[in-house]
């Protein structure tokens, strides 16, 4: 089970990296946050694994609306814990 979740996490990271390299370059910069949502997603998946990473990604995307000011929102060292697959 752990191996399967790790493989899924790596596949998602690969998809996001392909998006960054081949699709994102044609879009104008729109992200309200630093790092961008795609960089945040890769960092969350790499640091926390699939389950907690997806939860953090969902929370980040839900913050992306005109009424949120954006700003610096990275995965801090304090929030890093053991990787949960």
Swiss-Prot record:
Subcellular location as annotated: Cell membrane
GO cellular component entries: plasma membrane
SMART domains: Haemolytic
Superkingdom field: Bacteria
Keyword set, alphabetical order: Cell membrane, Membrane
InterPro entries for this protein: Membr_insert_effic_factor_YidD
Membrane topology: Peripheral membrane protein
Family from the record: Belongs to the UPF0161 family.
NCBIfam families hit by this protein: membrane protein insertion efficiency factor YidD (TIGR00278)
Role played: Could be involved in insertion of integral membrane proteins into the membrane.
Protein known as: Putative membrane protein insertion efficiency factor
The species this protein was found in: Buchnera aphidicola subsp. Baizongia pistaciae (strain Bp)
């Amino acid at each position: 089970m752990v191996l399967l979740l790790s493989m899924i996490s790596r596949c998602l990271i690969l998809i996001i990296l392909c998006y960054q390299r081949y699709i994102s370059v044609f879009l104008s910069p729109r992200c309200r946050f630093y790092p961008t949502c795609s960089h945040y997603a890769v960092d969350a998946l790499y640091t926390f694994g699939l389950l907690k990473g997806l939860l953090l990604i969902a929370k980040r995307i839900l913050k992306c609306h005109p009424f949120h000011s954006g700003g610096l929102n990275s995965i801090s060292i304090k929030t890093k814990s053991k990787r949960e697959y």
